[in-house]
């Protein structure tokens, strides 16, 4: 599904990179299957980590599954090379790429404006004014008619993106 969502990741200026404990020959063997099964070609790099150095460094080896089985880990790393999000799924549970796009959008938004995103937020929905910003400053920044004060610590405003 990642390959199918290439344009969505590109819209967010986000690059995808995969890691597998399989070797390059193994990747070359199953990469064509992605096109056949998923209807798109593999369009992002996959790191071969057969010695498991990277997988072990990032705790991607499931302790109960043997040393050849990685858990489904996702890391969102920002342009400053700071890990902003880590998600680890059990081997039996697939990842939710719509959620990953939502998180990338939320991180980019909250990096660019003094806001926070509420639970289940999606782009275009109202956001929470940062608790560190006064209501007066929020009204000046976002517009007096755009800030709704529910409580002194809970103020809503339109998505500024």
Describe the predicted segments one by one.
Residues 1-161:
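Chalcogenol-based redox active-site neighborhoods
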């Amino acid at each position: 599904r990642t390959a199918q969502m290439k344009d969505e990741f590109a819209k967010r200026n986000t690059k995808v990179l995969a890691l597998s404990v399989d070797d390059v020959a193994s990747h070359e063997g199953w990469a064509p299957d992605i096109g056949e099964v998923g209807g798109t070609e593999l369009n992002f790099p996959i790191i071969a980590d057969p010695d498991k150095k990277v997988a072990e460094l990032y705790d991607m080896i499931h302790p109960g599954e043997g040393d050849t089985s990685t858990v489904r880990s996702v890391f969102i790393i920002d342009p400053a090379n700071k890990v902003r999000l880590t998600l680890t799924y059990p081997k039996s549970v697939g990842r939710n790429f719509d959620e990953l796009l939502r998180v990338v959008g939320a991180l980019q938004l909250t990096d660019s404006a003094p806001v926070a995103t509420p639970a289940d937020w999606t782009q275009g929905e109202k956001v929470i004014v940062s608790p560190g910003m006064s209501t007066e400053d929020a009204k000046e920044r976002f517009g007096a008619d755009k800030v709704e004060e529910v409580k002194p610590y809970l103020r809503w405003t339109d998505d500024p993106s």
